[in-house]
Amino acid sequence: MQFPSLSCGILIKRYKRFLADILLPNGEQITLHCPNTGAMTGCATAGDTVWFSTSDNPKRKYAHTWELTQTQAGDFICVNTQRANQLVQEALEKRWIAELAEYQTVLPEQKYGSENSRIDFLLKADNQPDCFVEVKSTTLLTENGLGMFPDAKTERGQKHLRELAAIAESGQQAVIFFAILHTGIQRFAVAKQIDPQYAALFEQAKNTGVKVLAYKAQIELVQGKPEAMNLQFSCEI
């Protein structure tokens, strides 16, 4: 996945969930749109480098969108949650996900389930049951390279696990796919200490046959500037 042309600045602060102030190299201070409603723990530390895209849409109140954080330790974190589904769709269509490479058709945003949900991707293949894939953007790095999800309690995430478990029980394929968008993460676990109910439902879903996958994003740099990101390598669970 190619990034739009990116510029950078130094993070001053994130506030009101959707906004962030940064300082540009020329000394100008600007406000960005932050496309991430989560806690963003470890992703929004003052002094980190922010990489942002710029829209030419004159109707936008804030023309700039926060795409990546480059931490002072040198890690890159994709904070634009919309990129997770774009990455996974590209990986599915290019057959980079070995466990799902047999599926020829990738349908995004399909309605399903008894709780009025939308699945991120419905996969179809000849002579195979349909496969329902729910994507979770993962950016929380705890310690020793361990990444975790969720970074806050998530009733929506709990609903998705119930829906996936019901799909698996019906005889169809169900997958929860953790897109690891922090280059410092080397392995993955569910954050039981943050959301015990999510962790319990996660174990129940696995026991009903829901498959768990975690793949790590790779950032391609050109002269130190992020140019592209792809999702080709699995992450230890």
Curated annotation (Swiss-Prot):
CDD domains, per database record: SfsA-like_bacterial
Gene3D superfamilies found in the cross-reference section: 2.40.50.580, 3.40.1350.60
Highest taxon in the source lineage: Bacteria
GO molecular function annotation: DNA binding
Xref: InterPro entries: Glyco_hydro_1_AS, SfsA, SfsA_C, SfsA_N
Pfam family, one: SfsA
PANTHER family to which the protein is assigned, alphabetical: SUGAR FERMENTATION STIMULATION PROTEIN A
Stated family: Belongs to the SfsA family.
Official protein name in the record: Sugar fermentation stimulation protein homolog
Species this chain originates from: Actinobacillus pleuropneumoniae serotype 3 (strain JL03)
